[in-house]
Amino acid sequence: MRIEELKTPCYVIDEKQLKKNLSILQKVEKDTGCKILLAQKAFSCFYEYPLIGQYLDGTTASGLYEARLGKEEMGKENHVFAPAYKDADIKELGEIDRKSVV
C-alpha cells in the first residue's frame, strides 16, 4: 500500500528505523549491564511488542491493565508503579506475573 492511500488519521511505524533504534538500546544494555524497559505510556503500540521484546528486557506499567498488556503481548519483565493499589489489584498483579516488580 502506498502511503498516499492510507486513510487518516493513522499511525505509521517505520519498522526499519524502529529496529535501528532498538539495536542502539540493546547495545547500551550490553555495554553497561543495565536493563532498558519499554514505558508503555510513551509507546503503547502493542502490535510491535513482540519485536521490541527481542531487544529490550520488558515493560513498565502504571497499573493493572498496562501490566496485563505487557505480560500478554511481550511476556517479559514487568515493572508496575502506582501511588496506591486496591487490594484486588495487588492480588491480580501477583497472578499476572510472579516476576512483576510492584
Which sequence ranges carry the predicted segments?
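Structured catalytic/translocation cores of nucleotide/phosphate-coupled proteins
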Residues: 9, 26-29, 55-56
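Broad hydrophobic/π-residue packing in well-ordered secondary structure
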Residues: 10-13, 28, 36-38
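Generic N-terminal amphipathic, Lys/Arg-enriched alpha-helix
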Residues: 1-13
